[in-house]
Amino acid sequence: LQERLHFPEESRETELNTVNEEMQRLMQLINDLLNFSRYQNGLQKLTLAPCPLEELLVQAQGRFSEQAQQQGIDLLLEIQAPLPRLHADRAQLERVLDNLIDNALRHTASEGQIRLQARRHGERVIVSVEDNGEGIAYGQQGRIFEPFVQVGRKKGGAGLGLALCKEIVQLHGGRMGVYSRPGQGTQFYLALPL
């Protein structure tokens, strides 16, 4: 820092912003590691309450609509009504949706499309996030939910996001899967019990 005292003030501001961004990234990594550890060790408990799924999806779309618009990506919401209320941990399901939408935005090119979909299927609700991005190589699909695994050309984070998502969905008594064709896009889906 003493060496930087001689830099122009604009440069110092830029450097401090970079340090702050990296610090935030590291804090997120530490939080992800701690959260994943809690899930793996059975220490994470859900706070279950009635959860209006349609509202959850509308809000998730809203959180990412500006970013999608800036990237030139259509973020669509397709709901087959009526959707039942789930008995779920809303904050944890928001985390799952946010992670899936964020991943889709990172792996979808400009003028692409991301669809948030939800429908009832028997005694389950199926929620999916589907993009027409780069897709996932067939050889990588079997490992996609393992911790610290990253796929695709645009990597970021520690490779814990999808592993955390799967843990959260399983803790709700559901299951999570992926369907992808390289070069044609990816669909992550979760099946949650009513």
Residue map of PLM features:
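Conserved micro-motifs of the catalytic ATP-binding
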Residues: 41-46, 85-88
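Conserved catalytic submotifs in the C-terminal HATPase_c
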Residues: 47-52, 69, 74-84
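Short beta-strand/loop element within the Bergerat-fold HATPase_c
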Residues: 111-123
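Short conserved segment of the HATPase_c
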Residues: 136-148
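Short alpha-helical Gxxx[C/S/T] motif in the catalytic ATP-binding
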Residues: 161, 165
